[in-house]
Amino acid sequence: MLAKRIIPCLDVKAGRVVKGVNFIGLQDIGDPVEIAALYNQAGADEIVFLDITATYEERKTIVDVVEKTASKVFIPLTVGGGISTVKDIYTLLRAGADKVSLNSAAVKNPLFIQEGAEHFGSQCIVVAIDARKVEEDKWHVYVNGGRTDTGIDAVHWAKQVAELGAGEILLTSMDADGTKDGYNLRLTDIISANVSIPVIASGGCGSANHIVEVFAHTSVNAALAASIFHYGECTVQEVKQKLQYAGIEVRI
């Protein structure tokens, strides 16, 4: 069995790490380069760096911040935000990203996923799915930083991105995001059961127990969290120890 991964997330706006509730109400947390370096030392398995307003403001991800972050981080770094062309992917991989996260551009042009996978390999292509509940056991895909309802069924889209060559799905429950009430287990379970590629659970983590819970009750491969780590509520190692006690395999 593959070890489960713990992934701190750096949501970056104007070159600073921020954290908000339900995608709004953003608070400044600090410098992305310093924070990424701390998580690298703390035993994180990977880091996700999301330039959260890049797509909405129609500007490119801050490549220099990516370069500086990548120079301090020796674990896989996934970068997302404003990526809409193969050239964008190339630029970020060259800047030091190991993977790129596609969202709005992939929904607009699903063949972009295939194009990215063919050029750089599926292992480089993560598709981020921001999903919001519309009725019982039904979720829609949202784009543009969670501002626009596409009307696309999230389960159907997850299957499609896997078929198009994505190597991984970063699944965020917009209903849970920032609430610290725990991951959306129902959404996460349904999506991870419907695809054969790895799924990263995101949105709602408020404690180490929530991470234990998402691995115990769904087949996700990784858990992403921000505020519990940013605010020092628990460390990556504390989470991993809890997972070990629960019989869940992690890299210590």
Swiss-Prot record:
One of its GO terms (cellular component) is cytoplasm. Transmembrane segments: none annotated. GO terms for biological process: L-histidine biosynthetic process. Keywords: Amino-acid biosynthesis, Cytoplasm, Histidine biosynthesis, Lyase. The keyword Lyase applies. The active site is at residues 11, 130. The keyword Cytoplasm applies. Pathway: Amino-acid biosynthesis; L-histidine biosynthesis; L-histidine from 5-phospho-alpha-D-ribose 1-diphosphate: step 5/9. It catalyses: 5-[(5-phospho-1-deoxy-D-ribulos-1-ylimino)methylamino]-1-(5-phospho-beta-D-ribosyl)imidazole-4-carboxamide + L-glutamine = D-erythro-1-(imidazol-4-yl)glycerol 3-phosphate + 5-amino-1-(5-phospho-beta-D-ribosyl)imidazole-4-carboxamide + L-glutamate + H(+). Its EC number is 4.3.2.10. It is found in: Cytoplasm. It comes from the Bacteria. InterPro entries: Aldolase_TIM, His_biosynth, HisF, IGPS_HisA/HisF, RibuloseP-bd_barrel. GO terms for molecular function: imidazoleglycerol-phosphate synthase activity; lyase activity. Belongs to the HisA/HisF family. Heterodimer of HisH and HisF. IGPS catalyzes the conversion of PRFAR and glutamine to IGP, AICAR and glutamate. The HisF subunit catalyzes the cyclization activity that produces IGP and AICAR from PRFAR using the ammonia provided by the HisH subunit. PANTHER family: IMIDAZOLE GLYCEROL PHOSPHATE SYNTHASE HISHF, IMIDAZOLE GLYCEROL PHOSPHATE SYNTHASE SUBUNIT HISF/H IGP SYNTHASE SUBUNIT HISF/H. This is Imidazole glycerol phosphate synthase subunit HisF. It comes from Bacillus cytotoxicus (strain DSM 22905 / CIP 110041 / 391-98 / NVH 391-98). The gene is hisF.
